[in-house]
Every structure is written in structure tokens, then in C-alpha cells.
Amino acid sequence: YLDVNQIASYLLCLGQGAVFNGRKTCQIGCRAACQQPGCGGYKECEQIPNIRLHKYRCHCNSG
């Protein structure tokens, strides 16, 4: 059976929803973050709508 830590890693992907400054930084950081257990790999970096701030939100395939 799964222990609590294994269950937590499946339910919780720390990269999901992380915010980065700049598209390039997001792509690098998000790819690394989405390799963690429970994340399912990199999906995309979504630009947060704000003209002044170039911030991007990380999305993994699961989480």
C-alpha cells in the first residue's frame, strides 16, 4: 500500500501554479519543477494578463 508521503506526492505537484518572472525563466524553472513526483511533466507557461509585469504561471500535465 502507499504511505502518506507517496500519497502526498501524487496529490501535490509543487510546480503547478508556480509563478516566474519572464517567459524564458518560466520555461526553465517549470520544466524542472514538473519533473517532480506527481507532476506528470511540463505542459506550458501561461502569461498572467498584466502589461507591466511579465509574469508567467507554470502548468504541469497533472497536479
Curated annotation (Swiss-Prot):
Expression induction or repression: By bacterial infection.
Keyword check for Translocase, yes or no. no
Could you name the Gene Ontology cellular component terms for this entry? extracellular region
Q: For this UniProt entry, what is the primary localization, expressed as one broad class?
A: secreted
Give the UniProt keywords, A-Z: Antibiotic, Antimicrobial, Disulfide bond, Fungicide, Immunity, Innate immunity, Secreted
Where found? Secreted
**Post-translational modifications reported in the UniProt record:** Contains four disulfide bonds.
Note the InterPro entries from the entry. Answer: Megourin (IPR035171)
Q: Which Pfam families match?
A: Megourin
What biological processes does GO assign it? defense response to bacterium; defense response to fungus; innate immune response; killing of cells of another organism
Describe its partners and assembly state: Monomer.
Stated role: Has antimicrobial activity against Gram-positive bacteria and fungi.
Q: Could you tell me what this protein is called?
A: Megourin-2
User: What species does this protein belong to?
Assistant: Megoura viciae (Vetch aphid)
